[in-house]
Amino acid sequence: MARIELGKEGEKLAIDYLLTKGYKILEKNFRTPFGEIDIIAKDGNFIVIIEVKRRLSDKFGKPELSVNYTKQQKLKKLALYYISMLKKEYPVRFDVIAINDKKIEHIENAFF
């Protein structure tokens, strides 16, 4: 399976999972001049910035481990950009959804 197809399928699995958990999906593949946020959702009062990582095996490590410090810093900047567009302040949370084959692990508050 091509990398882009794998990512798109992973994002669909993640969205389906989030909807079953009661999240409201606000944005998918939110693009800015600085990069992209996979999913932006609302969970209660929180705006949740969600990075989705999918792998077919652990051969190259667990998917969640690829959300390293550099990626975290980038997501924080992208979140500030998104929040600045809103008319109201919301608490923000950063989650990672790691999918290994089709097994989903949702890591809430993955980083601050």
UniProtKB/Swiss-Prot annotation:
<dbReference type="Pfam" id="PF02021">
    <property type="entry name" value="UPF0102"/>
</dbReference>
<dbReference type="InterPro" id="IPR003509">
    <property type="entry name" value="UPF0102_YraN-like"/>
</dbReference>
<dbReference type="InterPro" id="IPR011335">
    <property type="entry name" value="Restrct_endonuc-II-like"/>
</dbReference>
<dbReference type="GO" id="GO:0003676">
    <property type="term" value="F:nucleic acid binding"/>
</dbReference>
<protein>
    <recommendedName>
        <fullName>UPF0102 protein THEYE_A1950</fullName>
    </recommendedName>
</protein>
<dbReference type="InterPro" id="IPR011856">
    <property type="entry name" value="tRNA_endonuc-like_dom_sf"/>
</dbReference>
<comment type="similarity">
    <text>Belongs to the UPF0102 family.</text>
</comment>
